[in-house]
């Protein structure tokens, strides 16, 4: 599912839209099924240690304003992951819950939660609320991580997100780096 949005946010705040979208996916999945999911910065939703959903946010912006955003969401609903080469890395609602899930019901719930959280994201108080909510379900918080960035690999402990939705990583010297994008992996444990 992809949506075109016209947020009244400065470009520096758009990483929060990815987090907000992941939060809306969480609320929709948990509101329509018995599944309980976690969020992984910057754009993933996990269930039982496997990736259930992903979010991709693309934008066009000027220096001080966002012109538009394309907010794309992919959820493994009734896909069968067990027995494929994705087993161990990804999962689906059907595989985890052992039953088919109504895509229509999930889509309606997702659109409802997206609308609500998108409206919330238009105000400073709403953005703070989104940050707090994301932090509650942050799979990386307090865990050892490696983050692949265009500039190399950053290792340390995930220390939450900042006010603009960037991942904070504390290295062994105590220095905290704020990362705008990257692929984060929990180290020292194997997921799924």
State where each predicted segment sits.
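Contiguous, small/hydrophobic- and glycine-enriched helical/loop subdomains that border
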Residues: 1-68, 100-105, 112, 116-124
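Short, acidic Gly/Pro/Ser/Thr-rich loop/turn segments
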Residues: 8, 77-80, 166
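Residue-level signal for pocket-adjacent positions within structured domains
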Residues: 40-41, 50, 81, 88-91, ...
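Conserved beta-strand residues within beta-sheet cores
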Residues: 42, 52-54, 131, 142-144, ...
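Short, acidic (Asp/Glu-rich) active-site segment that either coordinates a divalent metal cofactor
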Residues: 64-95
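Conserved, helical-rich catalytic subdomain that frames metal- and/or nucleotide-binding sites
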Residues: 96-151, 189-192
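Conserved RNA-binding domains used in RNP assembly and mRNA/RNA metabolism
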Residues: 141-192
